[in-house]
Structure formats: C-alpha cells, structure tokens
C-alpha cells in the first residue's frame, strides 16, 4: 500500500488550497490513479487500523439496495449517520442506483444483477459498467455519489475492476473505498468462476481536509506492513446472498488507529 502513502505525499507537496462545501477547506490535486494487483494480497491500509466491520456491512447494505441507515446501525456501523434524516433515510443513494436505477420510462434496472449476468455470458464485453450518477435524482440524495461508476474487465481468467470517484477524502474515505471495491471484485469473481486481477482507482478532486493534515503526516512516518489475505468461506447462490460471516481477513497487522473528524 505504499502507493497510497505516495498519494498523501503528492497532496501535501502539490495540493492547492481550496474552499469546499463543508467549510473545512482542503489541499487538492486533480486527476490521480492508483493500481493494486489483487494477487498480491487484500489492499487494506496497514499504516493505520481500519474498521473492517464497517467496510463489509456498508457493501452488503449497498448490495441490498437499502438506503436507510437502520440496517447499518443494527450492525454497529455509524459511518452514514451524519447524512441521514430523522427517519434514517438518505434518499436514492448508492443502493438505489445500483439495484433499482429509474429510467425515463418509469422502469427500474438492477445494474448489479445485469453486470454479473453479462460477465458470465459475455466476459469480453466493454459494457460491464455500473453507474450511480443518476442526474435526475441527484437533488433527492442527502449526499450525491462520490464514487460514481465502476467497470469490470476480464482477461486470462481474471476479473479486474476500475472505479471512478469525483471527490476523494483521501485520509478517511479512500482507504474504505479501496477495500470495498476490492471486496466487491472478489465476490463477483467468485460468482462468475474467475480469479481476481487488478483494482484501479481513478480520482477527480483528490484532497486532504485541512483538519486531516497532521494525521496524514503522522501516517507517513509509519512503515507499511504485509497485506492480509481475504478468505471467502462459502459461495452463495447469488451475489446478493453473502453475509458478514462469509468473509475472513487473515493476517491483518496494522499500526494503531489515527482519529480524524468527518467533514459533513
């Protein structure tokens, strides 16, 4: 995960000061890419401890098509609480767009089911794409998608994934995003009888909030440790039937947690 640390250094050295929606302010760079070979291990940042439970339950929540934080809260995950309304609703965010994209004709599209089926049927397709940036529904969302699209690519029996992210909270958010898309790639690869290949992140406005700068500098003093391995303990009949206990992270030995405030 040294490439992640190099991105932190890049922002600290080259970032432009910008004001932002949250009022916190950022150091920002534009247009950055990271690549991870999933054969080398599961890409969990080791220079600080990540809350794996939140990463797994959030992805399962997305895949359920759920947009209310109740499921997350029942499972000890609070990462979406700041944006939810008094009933726990977030509007048509990721889960709604992934599982029930509303078209102009009023019909809905299950993009996840469609892309899994297409990978199985036509792995050479260049249309293995899921999009969460539904312009017609952005104003109904409590937070428009930061990671707004992802594409799969099959070659030599391996499934690779590239995701696009318009806005990147590099200290708090990006380590979660990396792990989440790695997990999704492993799950879909298993469902499609494939091995995993490469995970690629492409970011637009890639930034450090000003109240994360000292934490990032602390993280840069730490030496990365070996990556853990992901074990999928069973193969469910569907991508939608995975449960929390189906996943095991083996050999995760991170440095201690570094606390930082969330910019809302």
From Swiss-Prot:
CDD domains: TS_Pyrimidine_HMase. Catalyzes the reductive methylation of 2'-deoxyuridine-5'-monophosphate (dUMP) to 2'-deoxythymidine-5'-monophosphate (dTMP) while utilizing 5,10-methylenetetrahydrofolate (mTHF) as the methyl donor and reductant in the reaction, yielding dihydrofolate (DHF) as a by-product. This enzymatic reaction provides an intracellular de novo source of dTMP, an essential precursor for DNA biosynthesis. The active site is at residue 146. This is Thymidylate synthase. It is found in: Cytoplasm. (6R)-5,10-methylene-5,6,7,8-tetrahydrofolate binds at residues 51, 169, 263. Keywords: Cytoplasm, Methyltransferase, Nucleotide biosynthesis, Transferase. It comes from the Bacteria. Gene3D superfamilies: Thymidylate synthase/dCMP hydroxymethylase domain. It is an enzyme of class 2 (transferase). The keyword Cytoplasm applies. Pathway: Pyrimidine metabolism; dTTP biosynthesis. DUMP binds at residues 21, 126-127, 166-169, 177, 207-209. One of its GO terms (molecular function) is thymidylate synthase activity. InterPro entries: Thymidate_synth/dCMP_Mease (IPR045097), Thymidate_synth/dCMP_Mease_dom (IPR023451), Thymidate_synth/dCMP_Mease_sf (IPR036926), Thymidylate_synthase (IPR000398), Thymidylate_synthase_AS (IPR020940). One of its GO terms (cellular component) is cytosol. The gene is thyA. It catalyses: dUMP + (6R)-5,10-methylene-5,6,7,8-tetrahydrofolate = 7,8-dihydrofolate + dTMP. Its EC number is 2.1.1.45. Homodimer. GO terms for biological process: dTMP biosynthetic process; dTTP biosynthetic process; methylation. Belongs to the thymidylate synthase family. Bacterial-type ThyA subfamily. The keyword Disulfide bond does not apply.
